[in-house]
Amino acid sequence: MCDAFVGTWKLVSSENFDDYMKEVGVGFATRKVAGMAKPNLIISVEGDLVVIRSESTFKNTEISFKLGVEFDEITPDDRKVKSIITLDGGVLVHVQKWDGKSTTIKKRRDGDKLVVECVMKGVTSTRVYERA
């Protein structure tokens, strides 16, 4: 199921993240602090639950979910969203919806890397992680 994603991942590169956060509606000060953070992602599977923990100097967050089941999420920038995460062709597709808006975050393996693509309207940010 999600075994290819299981492990601890450290951020090694980030492109266009500030523009993505701006499009999402994140304020200037939060964008600056979040943009400097180098989070680790810890992904695990516990029964039929997938757990994704993000740890950084900015904020620690954790979501646990069943694939295909909508859940309430509070994002690192404190948005209250409805989220649903599915597995589509080996890609974890995370859709967040709030206030008539939506963003999609895709996680996929590329060799020994974890590539996270964040899309909001026409703005895309790509963040690359390696095993920690």
Swiss-Prot record:
Coiled-coil boundaries: none
Binding site for a fatty acid: 127-129
Keyword presence, Transcription: no
Superkingdom: Eukaryota
Residue numbers carrying N-acetylcysteine: 2
Family statement drawn from the similarity comment of this UniProt entry: Belongs to the calycin superfamily. Fatty-acid binding protein (FABP) family.
Domain notes: Forms a beta-barrel structure that accommodates the hydrophobic ligand in its interior.
Name listed for the protein in its UniProt record: Fatty acid-binding protein, adipocyte
Native source organism of the sequence: Rattus norvegicus
